[in-house]
Amino acid sequence: MSFEAPTLDRIEDGGATFDLQERLAEGPVLMLWIGASCSGCHDWTELIKSAIDEGAFNNTSMGVVSVHRWAEFESLEDVHETFAVESNDSHYTPWTVVTPSTTTPTFEFGTNDDTGYPVYEAYGNPGTPTLQVIDQAGALVWQSKTYWANETLLGEAISFFD
């Protein structure tokens, strides 16, 4: 399964639109479902950022993408202020932040046929934070709904394909 959705359109986002199928051509993806007011999301963001800085992703082609989960409740400004402003005391995210709407469609991987499910429903209506590993065929292969960041679980996700 795949989807396309807007990003925060920063340099870190790699453009104004994120295409999961295109990104998966580079390797599997660790998706972190986030909310601006979600303390656990802030915690996971900080742990993933530290893991990247410490080289935990150096021996893998896995990329990281944060997906905003609460489009119906939080504004893009809330998401931007929380995850995109490097100079303040936010939870700056140095990887792609995707901002789908409640009606963003999903597509069958490889055929681009509409699945009939919007993105939130297609990925199981994840709460926040939820971590999901998506393999290079677009399949959800691993998931954790642990609220507070956990190094063991992050390590499990990063090494899933080892």
Where are these regions (language model features)?
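Proline-centered helix-kink/hinge sites
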Residues: F3-P6, G40, E46, P129, ...
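Loop/turn elements at helix/coil->beta-strand transitions in domains of secreted/extracellular proteins
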Residues: A25-M31, N58-V64, S90-W95, G127-P129, ...
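Thiol/disulfide oxidoreductase modules built on the thioredoxin-like
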Residues: L24-E26, S101-I158
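Short active-site neighborhood of thiol/selenol oxidoreductases, capturing the structured segment around
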Residues: F18-I48, G63-V67
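Structural microenvironment flanking redox-active thiols in thiol-disulfide oxidoreductases
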Residues: H42-P94, V98, T102-E108, T115-G116
